[in-house]
């Protein structure tokens, strides 16, 4: 027996046809089925943040605050103080830059158990500068008490949801839409907050990537292998706290370290790694791949990735240059 819910077809077995199995929306709904403390807040973007399933099936635990992101953060903090695990959703730019004072004063400072979930990070939107979050990691990473998480793809989203639920305190979860990331062939991955994941070991250059850039880094590894170079690729799914033990090991065992992020090179993953390398006098060649000190333009993601030097070919070129430097 099948039933239509919110325009999607729901099978009797409980799987949604139209919303991928590994989507955030599916993971949040299933987590809410298991934990009555979970509530879902939306700033008029239930479809665009994959939370329509909560709206349709658990309306008593879904709250639409309209296009009032600052108010949503305040409500989320208040509900968390009453014992809820509050998930607040919008696009990345709107739950970070637009509401930064509310996030700082009502979530980070009092350490309320609010999970701020942002979608369409960096260059993953065609809506141009107003919607391109290239500074959100920098903003959230600088807040005391804030944990920052970005899974590498659909295969890690379910684990990311479980990890942020288990983590007591504020979290910023940075996600791409399920429609922007093809259902991955790789098996489901775990996610331990604060511990990076080595995807594949190499010897010459360590490529530390986050989010969608992990896939680009793996492609770059294959490209530089054609030139006799071996790369370690690491999934840095937790941008704060950074896995400094892993970083130190990689810096001491490789000729070079390279970071790759769908974000500005100012204040993001690259800056965090550079800070640690410099402060601890680790003598390793280092470079960053990301959006340089510029606003991007509108366009599809492959075009923007190539234009701003975030694609696998550019990562490979920078890796080769690092390893060949005197």
Where in this protein do the model-derived segments appear?
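Thiamine diphosphate
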Residues: 1-174, 179, 190, ...
């Amino acid at each position: 027996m099948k039933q239509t819910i919110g325009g999607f077809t729901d099978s009797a077995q409980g799987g949604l046809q139209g919303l991928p199995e590994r989507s955030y929306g599916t993971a949040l709904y299933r987590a809410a089925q298991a934990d009555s403390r979970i509530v879902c807040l939306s700033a008029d973007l239930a479809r665009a943040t994959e939370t329509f399933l909560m709206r349709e099936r658990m309306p008593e635990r879904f709250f639409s605050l309209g296009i009032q992101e600052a108010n949503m953060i305040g409500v989320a903090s208040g509900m968390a103080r009453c014992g809820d695990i509050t998930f607040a959703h919008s696009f990345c730019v709107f739950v970070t830059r637009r509401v930064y004072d509310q996030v700082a004063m009502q979530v980070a400072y009092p350490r309320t158990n609010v999970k701020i979930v942002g979608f369409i990070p960096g260059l993953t939107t065609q809506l141009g500068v107003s919607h391109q979050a290239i500074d959100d990691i920098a903003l959230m990473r600088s807040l005391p008490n804030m944990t920052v998480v970005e899974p590498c793809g659909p295969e890690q989203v379910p684990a990311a949801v479980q990890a942020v639920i288990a983590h007591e305190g504020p979290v910023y979860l940075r996600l791409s839409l399920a429609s922007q990331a093809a259902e991955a062939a790789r098996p489901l991955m775990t996610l331990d907050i604060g511990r990076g994941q080595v995807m594949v070991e190499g010897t010459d250059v360590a490529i530390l990537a986050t989010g969608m850039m992990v896939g680009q880094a793996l492609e770059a590894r294959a490209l530089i292998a054609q030139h006799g170079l071996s790369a370690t690729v690491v999934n840095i799914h937790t941008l704060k706290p950074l896995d400094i033990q892993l970083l130190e090991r990689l810096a001491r065992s490789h000729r070079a370290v390279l970071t790759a992020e769908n974000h500005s090179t100012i204040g993001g993953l690259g800056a965090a790694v550079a800070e640690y390398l410099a402060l601890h006098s680790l003598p390793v060649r280092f470079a960053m791949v990301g959006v340089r000190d510029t606003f991007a333009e509108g366009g599809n993601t492959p075009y923007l990735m190539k234009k701003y030097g975030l694609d696998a070919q550019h990562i490979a070129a920078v890796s080769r240059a690092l390893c060949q430097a005197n």
